[in-house]
């Protein structure tokens, strides 16, 4: 498991600019080995336009900061349910400090693009020596397209960059972000539009249009399909996706059966149960 960075543990950037682009990040993990070539640092951007029934990062779905209550070890005392007057707690409706086991935190930290780039580039020599890099993930990073553009521009030519995306974004945003990436991982979950809407909340028209662009873009890429039992792993769906990806690289990812454990922590229900 990768090491999670907290913003508080890092000194602010010495660079000062008039216009700063902020992004909302719910996790940063180093020593990630499943998010691209080599050993990487993965930045998980908060917010997603889809709501996949099997999502393994429910804390990344909302575009806003939210409480994260760790379930393992909870005493059920109810103290955290009482609103408080701390400035940092008012908008969340619960107290961050009252839990006797310190299980309450906030999912979502704002980062300024230059500050985050400086943080990530502290490992530049290691990445360039070992063949790793930086991966933007989510949530859906393209939901914060302008922040991605600014961050990737700061990283460009200094370290290998990749993105993991559902492809659900305006093509204008999709193009301007992936053109700054050295590698693109894009999901194609379900080929049938109605099935896609049933299990993700949206149809796949935009996704397929962006996939077609990616196929002919010349940008190194791999399509991915999570194998969800009796939903995406059917022979009919996989055959249809195989036709869609054509000659492109295509990975089938195993189902993460532990995904449901995090849902209660952000007050959501796991739909696959």
Language model features: what each stretch is:
Residues 72-82, 93-130, 134-135:
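Glycine/small-residue-rich loop that forms an oxyanion/phosphate-binding "nest" at active or ligand-binding sites
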Residues 22-47, 53, 58:
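N-terminal cysteine/histidine-rich coordination modules
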Residues 42-55, 68-102, 140:
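Cysteine-centered iron-sulfur cluster-binding motifs in ferredoxin-type domains/subunits
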Residues 2-9:
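Targeting/processing segments of secretory and organellar proteins
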Residues 57-67, 105-108:
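Iron-sulfur (Fe-S) cluster-binding segments and ferredoxin-like electron-carrier domains
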């Amino acid at each position: 498991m990768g090491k999670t960075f907290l913003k508080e543990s890092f000194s602010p950037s010495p660079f000062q600019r008039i216009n700063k682009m902020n992004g909302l990040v719910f996790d940063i993990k180093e020593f990630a080995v499943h998010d691209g070539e080599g050993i990487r640092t993965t930045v998980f951007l908060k917010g997603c336009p889809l709501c996949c029934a099997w999502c393994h990062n429910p804390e990344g779905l909302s575009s806003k900061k939210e409480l994260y209550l760790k379930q393992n070890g909870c005493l059920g005392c109810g103290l955290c349910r009482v609103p408080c007057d701390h400035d940092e707690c008012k908008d969340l409706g619960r107290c961050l400090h009252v839990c006797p086991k310190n299980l309450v935190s906030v999912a979502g930290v704002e980062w300024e693009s230059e500050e985050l780039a400086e943080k990530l580039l502290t490992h530049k020599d290691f990445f360039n020596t070992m063949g790793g890099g930086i991966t933007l993930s989510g949530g859906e990073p393209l939901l914060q397209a302008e922040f991605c553009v600014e961050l990737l521009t700061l990283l460009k030519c200094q370290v290998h960059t990749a993105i993991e995306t559902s492809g659900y974004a305006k093509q204008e945003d999709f193009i301007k972000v992936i053109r700054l990436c050295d590698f693109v991982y894009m999901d194609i979950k379900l080929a049938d539009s109605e099935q896609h809407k049933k299990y993700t909340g949206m149809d796949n028209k935009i996704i397929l249009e962006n996939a077609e662009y990616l196929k002919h873009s010349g940008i190194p890429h791999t399509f991915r399909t999570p194998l969800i039992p009796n939903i995406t792993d059917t022979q009919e769906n996989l055959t249809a996706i195989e036709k869609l990806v054509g000659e492109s690289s295509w990975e089938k990812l195993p189902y993460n059966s532990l995904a449901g454990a995090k849902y209660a922590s952000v007050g959501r229900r796991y739909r696959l149960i």
